[in-house]
Swiss-Prot record:
Belongs to the phosphoglycerate mutase family. BPG-dependent PGAM subfamily. Substrate binds at residues 10-17, 23-24, 62, 89-92, 100, 116-117, 185-186. SMART domains: PGAM (SM00855). Its EC number is 5.4.2.11. Catalyzes the interconversion of 2-phosphoglycerate and 3-phosphoglycerate. The gene is gpmA. The active site is at 11 (tele-phosphohistidine intermediate), 89 (proton donor/acceptor). CDD domains: HP_PGM_like. Keywords: Gluconeogenesis, Glycolysis, Isomerase. NCBIfam families: pgm_1, PRK14115.1. This is 2,3-bisphosphoglycerate-dependent phosphoglycerate mutase. One of its GO terms (molecular function) is phosphoglycerate mutase activity.
Length: 230
């Protein structure tokens, strides 16, 4: 029986990553370096002979473009791809579009670290009059107003990512499918917290770099056995 494997990967560097801005739900494209990261990831995946049955990503183009590059470069563009807002980055509320260093100077390192890395703390809410509010984005027109976050903690992100894992992705793993998930720093932190049973206090130390394929191997009972970067 073949080993059950999933690759988790954060998108390549985005234009706002390069500018050190909070991005969240804003639909920002890749930099040249971000595209290069995706191509290098594809090279590693191909070198290690990973053949995928299915792929998942968010509805944000930095993740979608990264996935496209990987599938193209590994000659797997034909596999089924499913996109969901449930895999989006966490919503950074009123911080979206702002420079991280300027926010640190205004609020202090400790507060910004809590907003960025803690499990339960939310950034300030986004006002509905703000142009970055998701209500103005056509991608979310089918969602009800109460489903549109104006800010999210990692816990709130966890509460949308994990049901998607359990009801959409896990059934494919149970069928012995090899799966590729290209998502975002915090949607992946939420999933890794769940898979590794990481405590609320320890999750603050987990950071995920852009463009690095992380392999999870699972037992026949779908329990994580080990994980490693390619």
């Amino acid at each position: 029986m073949k080993k059950k494997k999933i690759i988790l990967m954060r998108h390549g560097e985005s234009k706002w990553n390069k500018l050190n801005k909070f991005t969240g739900w804003q639909d920002i494209g890749l930099t040249k370096n971000g595209k290069k990261e995706a191509k290098l990831a594809a090279k590693l995946i191909k070198k290690n002979n990973f053949i995928f049955d299915i792929a998942y990503t968010s509805i944000l183009k930095r993740a979608i473009y990264t996935l496209w590059i990987i599938l193209k470069k590994t000659n797997q563009i034909w596999i089924p791809v499913y996109k969901s807002w449930k895999l989006n980055e966490r919503n950074y509320g009123a911080l979206e579009g702002l420079n991280k260093e300027k926010i640190k100077k205004k609020y202090g390192d400790e507060q910004v670290q809590l907003w960025r890395r803690s499990f339960t703390v939310c950034p300030p809410n986004l006002n509905i009059s703000n142009k970055y509010h998701p209500i103005y984005d056509i991608k979310y027109k089918k969602l009800k107003k109460h489903e549109l976050p104006t800010s999210e903690s990692l816990e709130m992100t966890f509460n949308r990512v994990i049901p998607f894992w359990e009801f959409k992705i896990l059934p494919q793993l149970e069928k012995n499918k090899n799966i590729l998930i290209v998502a975002h720093g915090n949607s992946l932190r939420a999933l890794i917290k769940y898979l590794g049973n990481i405590s609320d206090s320890d999750i603050i130390d987990l950071d995920i770099s852009t463009g690095k394929p992380l392999v999870y191997e699972f037992s026949n009972t779908n329990k994580p056995l080990k994980y490693y970067y390619l």
